Amino acid sequence: MLRYARTVRFSQVGNSVRTSSGSFGPIRTIFISSHDRKSPSHSLSPISNLPNHNDSSTERARKTLDDDFQRKIKYDELKTRKRIEDLRALTKKVSQLVKQKQELSKIAKIPVPSDEIKKLKSVEDVVKVTKSQHVATVRTNIPEPETVTTHIEKEESEFVMEQNAFIVPATPIPEEIAKRLGLALRYLVSETNQNWTLVLDQLKADRGFKDLPYTTVVDFLTKIPASELQKVIPKVDQLLKEAKIPKTAKILNLYIASLASGSAVPNQVIQILENYCKRIRKLKKGKLPKRTCEVMVQAYGKNGNINRIQDLLSEMKLHKIEISGMALTNILATCVYKARDHKQAVEIFDTMRFQKEVYKPGTRAYQDIIVSYVNNDDIEKAIDIYREMITEKIEPNQQIMVALARGCASREAFKFKSWDFIFEINRNNWTPTLPTYEYMLYLSSRDGDLALTRALYSRLLKDNTVSLRSFNFLLLAYSKARLSDDLGEPFLINADEKGRKFRFNVIDRSGISDPTNQFPFLPFNELTTKEQIMAESSAIWAHACLNNSELINSESTTSYLNIASERGTLSDFIDRMEGSTFLDEKINNVLSGVVIEEPDVVVETTDFLTQKSSAHEKYDETSIVKSPILKSIQSKRTPRVSLTYVVALKAAGKFNNYNFANRIWQERGKFRKTETFKKLPRTEKDKLDFQFATQMVRTLTELNLLEDALAVLKSTEYQFRWTWKELDVLKSAAIRQGNTNVAQTVRSIARRAQLTYEGKIRRKDYKRYVMQRGY
């Protein structure tokens, strides 16, 4: 049959298809037969109504229809089988629940030891009453003595004290000791309520460890939890001494493990552990067992003593004792959390990673090294380690996600990934812990999202889980809050749809706008003015002083002052500084022999040092940004620290008040002479001085005193490691004002610092290097 090609254009209008000679619609090539060409108006009929002839296309269509019919039948069959399997599984589950309920009902009918004891006591009372009545020959309805005796024998046959005194034991105790304990086992009612002191007292009353095999005694000691064993070590020693059982290395190892089981091990406990180790060395011919070494590594780690860990590792190497992966993990945790030695932590982790056959790092090791990288502001490497975990198919945990979120928030390039890691916790169906909620507060407060921070904090209030960390993050949110008139990027959490929904739901369900809320939140979901921020932060501070004074310390006070520096006025800042801090007057009276007399200067009324330090007299009755309660709580004040003066200098620069700045750095000089500052390590003193000097340079620059800022810089050039991070503000201001002398001097100081501290090569040294190499 002849076939030919015909090209037409189609456009669809409604449900009909028509050809068009216009320019719209795709070009399609349709092959039609001569039969179709002769009858162009013939409508397409269903496949079932096709003419029955030997056309191949018709056969293929019928075959396709049959295949589709068979496919639907198979699909329905599979669907039916799936339903049958679900019904079977449901039936099985129901039967298991019924069976479990029957077993629980049987267990509920089992008498507990106290019930049996009550029955026994009631029988004894009946015996006493019967005997007395028998002597008096008074006839009553009480059974005869013979009947009572028979009843007693029956009760004793049904109730055997040794078998039923502790029906469901919390700890499987050796049988020989269980017989001696008797009713004392009832003090071990559950895993969470154990009184081993009374158990040992009862055991001592019944021969103690006498005539018991050594293995039985050791087995009994291993059943005592480590946290409980450290409390009863003196009693155990006495029982061992009375039974003349020597304290072997195995028993001493139990002592060591129990004393090292706490979250921190003080120096006094370390001394006791080292004495135990000396006794073990005598028993083992000068060599510590591997188990003892591993426990001591853990103990030194909790004590933060890296040097003793290194000595112990050298001893293990000398005696050819191979260190285990668990010991390396403990050392890694010590370097990260106690010693904060990032370089050593990286070396240990690399050792574990490149010797996977022996020290394969697990989830805990990856968690510790990721936290170390985040703490050292290397989020790129932390993300690389996380990707390595995924490649090695090592299961991450919630702490890793929180650490990565915290690290991403501190970097401009990664800040949009911070909430993604938080939402990963929800994808893995993990229950958020308190640190997770706290760092959600941190992310929102750092981003200036005050509404979300207040909503999350209200959730912690409902759960009664407010901590010092979460309180500080709330205060941080007030100082960084974005107001309605602040222009900038949208909140990070609004970067995707999931974040927007999460933020809306948390704020909507917080209940902050409820006027009956007991916490002093203003009844608005969002604060829109600086006055609202100042008023609410003041009310929250007063509430903490009255009801939760443990939240008040130097760190939270500094955050409280920073709110006034960012959102208030200079008078607000001075009022808060006077009302919440004081200068510790414990100053060393032995000063230098030279006394410089300052000339009398006229200062403004805002100078808080020339006025009487009294929050009551400074209180403004008409102020709407101060809580009235603060008028009567003058005692809730903390000593000023170095960071207090840094924040005060920042406020002086922002409000352009030189006199206030001058008095601040004079008082900071007095603060350096206090006992609190003198007791600090040298490195900490240098760190705080550099922090204050950096703020001095910034404040003087904001006051347009560029020469004074340069003088501070030149006087401390060789004392501190200045970088462009601290010097860029002064250099930029000098360039804007056209002060080339200051700009050039700042560049010279930065260049010399790079040569001295950063290892930058000099130009002439580079030329000499090229001449010697010849290229």
From Swiss-Prot:
Residues 56-65 have a biased composition (Basic and acidic residues). The keyword Repeat applies. Residues 41-55 have a biased composition (Polar residues). It comes from the Eukaryota. GO terms for biological process: mRNA processing; RNA splicing. PPR repeats lie at residues 289-323, 324-355, 362-396, 397-432, 433-467. It is found in: Mitochondrion. The keyword Mitochondrion applies. Keywords: Mitochondrion, mRNA processing, mRNA splicing, Repeat, Transit peptide. Binds to mitochondrial small subunit 15S rRNA. Belongs to the CCM1 family. Regulates mitochondrial small subunit maturation by controlling 15S rRNA 5'-end processing. Localizes to the 5' precursor of the 15S rRNA in a position that is subsequently occupied by mS47 in the mature yeast mtSSU. Uses structure and sequence-specific RNA recognition, binding to a single-stranded region of the precursor and specifically recognizing bases -6 to -1. The exchange of Ccm1 for mS47 is coupled to the irreversible removal of precursor rRNA that is accompanied by conformational changes of the mitoribosomal proteins uS5m and mS26. Involved in mitochondrial-nuclear incompatibility, a major determinant in reproductive isolation between species, through hybrid incompatibility of Ccm1 and its interacting partner 15S rRNA between yeast species. This is Mitochondrial 15S rRNA processing factor CCM1. It comes from Scheffersomyces stipitis (strain ATCC 58785 / CBS 6054 / NBRC 10063 / NRRL Y-11545) (Yeast).
